[in-house]
Amino acid sequence: MKTCNLTDRMEVKMIMLLFQILAISTLKSDSADIPEGYIQENVALRGRATQSAQLRGDHSGIAHASNAIDGNRDSVFYHGSCTHTEADKPWWRVDLLQVYTITSVTITNRGDCCEERISGARILIGKHLENNGINNPQCSVIGPMAAGETKTFRCPQPMIGRYVTVYLPKAESLHLCEVEVNVLFPAPC
C-alpha cells in the first residue's frame, strides 16, 4: 500500500496537475463516468460570484449572483436560490480564486417561469477578466432546457481557467438556479 509522504507543496501541485491531465485525456467525449482513482468536485462552491446587473424591484433581494453557487438546485426563483439579472446582454461569472483544469459545467435552469430564456447562453472559461470574461474561450452553448432541468455541458477538451462566465448575447434576463464547475482530482491516497 502506497502512502503520500511528499512534503514539497509545489511538487504535490505539479503531480496533481499531471494526474488531472492524464485522467482527462482518458475520458471519452460522450462518457459521464469518472475514471477510477479520481473524484469529481464542484469547485464553484469555493468561488465568488458576480453578475452584470441584479434584478430591480420587489424581488431584487433574492436575486443575488451568489445564489447560483450555494449548492442548492432548487429551481423556484421565489425560494431564494436562483440569480436574476436585468436584460440587455447579461452575464454571470464565478471567480474560482485559482486556476483549475475544468472538464464540464452543470447548469440548473429556472423551473417556475421563463425556461426558454437560457437558450443561446454561452459558457466561457479562461484566466482573464477582459470584457467581464466574455472574451474567454467558449466551453459550450446552452440549447433549449426544460423548466427546472439540470444539464451538464462538457467542454470539447479540458479548459484551464479561473473564471467561468455564462453570457446571454441577447436582450433578455438571465437566471441561473445552480452553476457547478466540475474538476477531476486524484482520489485521496
Curated annotation (Swiss-Prot):
Membrane spanning stretches: none
Signal peptide: 1-31
InterPro entries in the record: BG_Antigen-Binding_Lectin, FTP1, Galactose-bd-like_sf
Taxonomy, superkingdom: Eukaryota
Alphabetical keyword list: Calcium, Disulfide bond, Lectin, Metal-binding, Secreted, Signal
Motif residue range(s): Cell attachment site: 110-112
Positions bound to Ca(2+): 67, 70, 72, 81, 177-178
Entry GO CC: extracellular space
Any one GO biological process: regulation of complement activation, lectin pathway
Residues engaged in binding alpha-L-fucose: 84, 110, 117
A molecular function GO annotation: carbohydrate binding
Compartmental location: Secreted
Organs and tissues of expression: Gill mucous cells.
Pfam families: F5_F8_type_C_2
Bridged cysteine pairs (disulfide): 82-177, 113-114, 139-155
Location of region: F5/8 type C-like: 40-188
Classification via SMART domains: FTP
Self-association state and partner proteins as the record states: Homotrimer.
Function of the molecule: Acts as a defensive agent. Recognizes blood group fucosylated oligosaccharides including A, B, H and Lewis B-type antigens. Does not recognize Lewis A antigen and has low affinity for monovalent haptens.
Family membership: Belongs to the fucolectin family.
Note: Binds 1 calcium ion per monomer.
Name under which the protein is recorded: Fucolectin-7
